[in-house]
């Protein structure tokens, strides 16, 4: 099950560590959604092709393309540079949909007060990062994650590094954030 917490402000230590505040300050999933619009679903990773929740998500949201990515030093070409790029604060013009099939990692997202929230994802976690939110990704200390990526149509994975506040997706995101993300995409 996904865990979410406010991150400390430490930037000099390993990004793959948990980076809890002292004392730790956790969020529940409804609060994560209200602050960021990030959605979470529990999926049967061992039989994801037949998972009813995933099937419904794909049908309702038009996810017609998917692929698989494995992030580890052994499997990812140009590993160090890819991780550096993943951890650079950025946004996308489309949702970022990830289902963890194996391993673990962290998605960091900014809340409505510009604080970093760390989302720990493990096998069976599916998260949807909304278009227009500043975020980043890193592996944890296990240095391994295998995930399915879902897209509407042909895959477009273009990161727009911060600042990108002039993009329409960012303006739309901020409008929805101001409204505490009235749930439009219920499954």
Curated annotation (Swiss-Prot):
E.C. designation(s): 1.13.11.54, 1.13.11.53
Tagged with keyword Cytoplasm: yes
Keywords carried by this UniProt record: Amino-acid biosynthesis, Cytoplasm, Dioxygenase, Iron, Metal-binding, Methionine biosynthesis, Nickel, Nucleus, Oxidoreductase
CDD domains: cupin_ARD
One record GO biological process: L-methionine salvage from methylthioadenosine
GO molecular function: acireductone dioxygenase (Ni2+-requiring) activity; acireductone dioxygenase [iron(II)-requiring] activity; iron ion binding; nickel cation binding
GO CC term, one of those recorded: nucleus
Family: Belongs to the acireductone dioxygenase (ARD) family.
Its biological purpose: Catalyzes 2 different reactions between oxygen and the acireductone 1,2-dihydroxy-3-keto-5-methylthiopentene (DHK-MTPene) depending upon the metal bound in the active site. Fe-containing acireductone dioxygenase (Fe-ARD) produces formate and 2-keto-4-methylthiobutyrate (KMTB), the alpha-ketoacid precursor of methionine in the methionine recycle pathway. Ni-containing acireductone dioxygenase (Ni-ARD) produces methylthiopropionate, carbon monoxide and formate, and does not lie on the methionine recycle pathway.
Name of the molecule in the record: Acireductone dioxygenase
